[in-house]
A protein has these predicted regions:
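Conserved AMP-binding/adenylate-forming core of the ANL superfamily
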Residues: 26, 35, 43-96
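Short catalytic-loop micro-motif centered on adjacent basic/acidic residues
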Residues: 105-107
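Flexible, non-catalytic linker and terminal segments flanking ANL/adenylate-forming cores
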Residues: 1-27
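Structured binding elements
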Residues: 102
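Anion (oxyanion) recognition and catalysis
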Residues: 99
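Conserved donor sugar-nucleotide recognition element shared by glycan-biosynthetic enzymes
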Residues: 30
């Protein structure tokens, strides 16, 4: 028999009533959620960096290319990959590519 546990959350008494007490999180993986955004909004801006905008579709192509390269060098599901890069679009693509192949990103 399943039992529901009520967790005390005293901070909820002082929150704005417009703010929900709980959130409905996606059941998709991180990459699955990005892929969903690509399908829904392919031509929307995913990010802007140094004056250049990149759409979700363009970003997804970069993530896939990076994931393909990771697989080519032998990165597999469950492997740990340390990402030591500056805050730049390439870091974002690498992070999602590592997750796409099922590896664990360590930053």
């Amino acid at each position: 028999m399943s039992e529901t546990v009520q967790i005390k959350a005293p901070w909820l008494a002082s929150k704005d009533p417009e703010v929900p007490s709980t959130l409905n999180y996606s059941t998709l993986s991180m990459c699955g959620r990005v892929e969903e955004m690509v399908r829904q909004y392919p031509n929307y801006t995913a990010y802007e960096f140094m004056g250049k905008t990149t759409t979700y579709a363009e970003m997804w192509q970069k993530i896939n290319a990076c994931a393909k390269s990771l697989k080519a060098i032998g990165i597999r599901e469950g492997d740990k990959v340390t990402i030591c890069m500056p805050n730049a679009p390439q870091t974002l693509c690498m992070f999602y590519a590592v997750n796409m192949v099922g590896a664990i990103a360590n930053m």
